[in-house]
Amino acid sequence: MKMMDANEIIEFISKSEKKTPVKVYIKGQLDNLSFGEGVQSFINGNTGVVFGEWSEIEAVLNENAALIEDTVVENDRRYSAIPLLDLKGVEARIEPGAIIRDQVEIGKGAVIMMGASINIGAVIGEGTMIDMNAVLGGRATVGKNCHVGAGAVLAGVIEPPSASPVIIEDGVVIGANAVILEGVRVGAGAVVAAGAIVTEDVPANTVVAGTPARVIKEIDEKTKGKTEIKLELRRLNEDQ
């Protein structure tokens, strides 16, 4: 897995065309309406749906107002610089309501739950679960077979570009509503307790808790039993 450099992300955002895509349901005398090459139109008789940039569609609607009986416009962004990730080729389980931006890497067998937000440049390893409403900021990197609990936040680092991103090594379990601040590395096999605020690196195979988080013990068999990663939850259809 390759992490994007902060300057690469900044350049990507800077040079991207800022878009306001819309979906418009339209009713009226539509036979001779032309929305141009940049707009997809699906018109049948006096009703139809068009997809495209709002400025282009709005111009056609205004020019042909006398022919149009009614419209409904669906719009969820304005001058957006980063599209959402095309999920069709991702070999992972991604549930409805997850927001995943372009230029995110997701490993095979990962699980992204409802409401998770994953920003540009983030990397998610094979078999890792990102639970409900968790947030992975820009360039946050999570290794293989981890669990990032519901509502947890891995701080993002794009600006300033010199700052170090959050790195979560393999086999880490992060409890619900924990916060991992910029530049922190969590060592392999570690456990971050629910609600912890992690401001410093976490040694491998330790448990940290509190605000700010401190090491409270080494990983033992009891802890392993409580934080076991279940591979059954990560199987895709072809793995069954």
Swiss-Prot record:
GO terms for biological process: diaminopimelate biosynthetic process; lysine biosynthetic process via diaminopimelate. HAMAP family: DapH (MF_01691). NCBIfam families: DapD_Ac. Belongs to the transferase hexapeptide repeat family. DapH subfamily. This is 2,3,4,5-tetrahydropyridine-2,6-dicarboxylate N-acetyltransferase. Catalyzes the transfer of an acetyl group from acetyl-CoA to tetrahydrodipicolinate. It is an enzyme of class 2 (transferase). Keywords: Acyltransferase, Amino-acid biosynthesis, Diaminopimelate biosynthesis, Lysine biosynthesis, Repeat, Transferase. InterPro entries: DapH, DapH_N, Hexapep, Hexapep_transf_CS, Trans_hexapeptide_repeat, Trimer_LpxA-like_sf. Its EC number is 2.3.1.89. The keyword DNA-binding does not apply.
